[in-house]
Curated annotation (Swiss-Prot):
Protein name in the entry: Ribosome-recycling factor
Domain of life, source organism: Bacteria
Keyword Cytoplasm assigned: yes
Species this protein is from: Clostridium botulinum (strain Langeland / NCTC 10281 / Type F)
Signal peptide: none
Protein localization: Cytoplasm
Recorded family membership: Belongs to the RRF family.
One GO process term, biological-process aspect: translational termination
Role: Responsible for the release of ribosomes from messenger RNA at the termination of protein biosynthesis. May increase the efficiency of translation by recycling ribosomes from one round of translation to another.
NCBIfam families in the record: frr (TIGR00496)
């Protein structure tokens, strides 16, 4: 029973890290990254479709994203979706491809992005701690099932070690992202 709780904690905490990495990848850092477009969907034949399913997204230069739709009729829908997004990018449509030039980040913009990165990191830490609390509650409920106090204490210590490990990983991910943003 305790093993299942520890396994559940590990899985949930791991998913939190994956979600954090995905969220940070979509934040612009002054250089082109196809993950920036992951959250953007365009209306294509009546349904909202992610851009990466509408065409090939490549990086011909450090600060340029090139979107080559498989269906040229999707060009205007892709362009509208990018304009409506919160990325603040101006697509250039030449009739066959869409170019997105990523502007240089100003010092103020960098600082704002770093604030957002830190906030996202804090949210991930809160999620990890919430998972710890839930798992500790599950372990405490095992007292009713005649599990010894020593086993419960050991399980709580193991959960705390996992929590510390994942919090440390979040700190290193956030630190790396901050360096990436500030060093461009």
């Amino acid at each position: 029973m305790i093993k299942e709780i520890l396994k559940k904690a590990d899985e949930k905490m791991g998913k939190t890290i994956v979600a954090l990495k995905r969220e940070l990848a979509s934040m612009k850092a002054g250089r082109a990254n196809p993950a920036m477009l992951d959250r953007i969907e365009a209306e294509y034949y009546g349904s909202m479709t992610p851009l990466n399913q509408l065409g090939n997204i490549s990086i011909p230069e450090a600060r340029v994203l090139l979107i080559q739709p498989w269906d040229k009729s999707a060009l205007s829908a892709i362009e509208k979706a990018i304009l409506k997004s919160d990325l603040g990018l101006n697509p250039s449509n030449d009739g066959t491809v869409i170019r997105l030039v990523i502007p240089e980040l100003t010092e103020e913009t960098r600082k704002n992005i770093v604030k957002t990165v830190k906030k996202t990191g804090e949210e991930a830490k809160v999620a990890i701690r919430s998972i710890r609390r839930d798992c500790n509650d599950d372990v405490k409920n095992l007292k009713k099932d005649d599990v010894s106090e020593d086993d419960i204490k050991k399980a709580e210590d193991d959960i705390q070690k996992k929590t510390d490990k994942y919090i440390k990983e979040i700190d290193s991910i956030i630190s790396a992202k901050e360096k990436e943003i500030l060093s461009i």
